[in-house]
Amino acid sequence: MKSTERLIFHIDVNSAFLSWESARRVSQGLPDLREIPSCVGGDPKKRTGIVVAKSIPAKKYGIQTGEPVAMALRKCPNLVIVPSDFELYDKCSRAFKAICASFAPVMESFSIDEVFLDMTGTSLIYPDPVAAAHELKDKIHRELGFTVNVGISTNKLLAKMASDFQKPDRVHTLFPDEIQEKMWPLPIRNLLFLGKASEQKLLNQGIRTIGDLARERASNVQYWLGEKTGHQLWQYARGIDDSPVKAVPDEAKGFSVETTFNDDITSIEQVFPILLEQCDVLATRMRRKDKKCNCISVTFRTLDFRNRSHQTKLENATDLTDEIYINATRLFKEFWKGQPLRLIGVALTGLTDGTYEQMSLFEDTENKERRRKLDAAMDEIRMKFGNDKITRASIMNSNARIGRKAKAQMKNENTEEQ
């Protein structure tokens, strides 16, 4: 490759949750879960218990990620099941990312078990990218006890596609001159970011492989999938992606809170009080900093340990708790499909000066002013007497609370401002 071209690595932990549990057990002299039929999953007696990670021997029994643990046990009665351990996953993820960060000037954390490295300009240190990838892969295995795949290319899309090739413990390249040979023959469902609905639409048009999509006219793809989605996926099929590797998100600094649950959250009646308390905490913090937000994001984590995030841009910036909560609940209802949840979070970004307000001719100004006075009254009570001295009734009546962390942050802000 040319020295002026970008060089991107994508590193993905192989069966992360199972591998991390296995590494711990091996260090304790216990059997390696990767070598026996095993899985990480919930309690088989619970309806919501599912397989979130499985070993290769378990896969040979037909056990699938996402299926009920009870079904997996019917397929393999001697299946070893271990419970999820969030503290272990966080510890292993941090150690994994620390090693990756030591290899490149810029690292982007893509998920708990994936990172992108921008290796551009490191040719004097690592003249052979493949050798460098092997060095990184082997260092992780040697020091942490689990394996990774490394994908190498000139952009993030192709690097991630490459890391999904044969597993485990492999290094793969997918440079632009390798696309036709390595990527185009793959089934269309293998294309990164292609959803099931778009896949079905393409199959209905006779598009079976990534190469079929790449060779199709862009205008046809846009007609089938919509202008924006169609254009993006057509470009992806041709290996085109100019997104940068970002060490931090490029969104404006904002306020956020997340709540992790020991037990599954399964009903919308459980979710709404949690969202209200989160929005209440964040809006209070934001008003104390004299800010308003233009963007509201809601994140939730399902039993496969993947976060789903969705956001909405507001027509006018706001700092009102009720407005933020209404938008957060709308977002959640639009995107939640009823899966059991282990985490819910809200983020407020796109911050503006709180003293500026854009007026609308059609806005219910009387109702808005009433809500503003309510927020101001609650803010004053909390500032004078403490954050726990006043709480909304719907939150008090709920047994799901967001915990101490967010409120501790509010307490610290009180101290700073006094």
Predicted feature locations:
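Gly/Gly-Pro- and Ser/Thr-rich, intrinsically disordered tail segments characteristic of DNA damage-repair
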Residues: M1-Q232, R238, D242, T284, ...
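DNA-contacting surface of Y-family translesion DNA polymerases
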Residues: K2-S3, N190, S198-L341
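Short, charged/polar surface micro-motifs in flexible loops or helix N-caps
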Residues: N14-A16, P44-R47, L303-R306, L351-G354
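Short small-residue beta-strand/loop micro-motif enriched in glycine and branched aliphatics
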Residues: I81, R306-H310, T355-E357
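Short, hydrophobic beta-strand segments
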Residues: V115-G121, S309-T312, Q358-D364
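A glycine-rich phosphate-binding loop feature that marks nucleotide/adenosyl-phosphate handling sites
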Residues: T154-L157, Q235-R238, K292-T302, L341-T352, ...
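C-terminal hydrophobic structural anchor segments
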Residues: T318-D319, E323, T329-M383
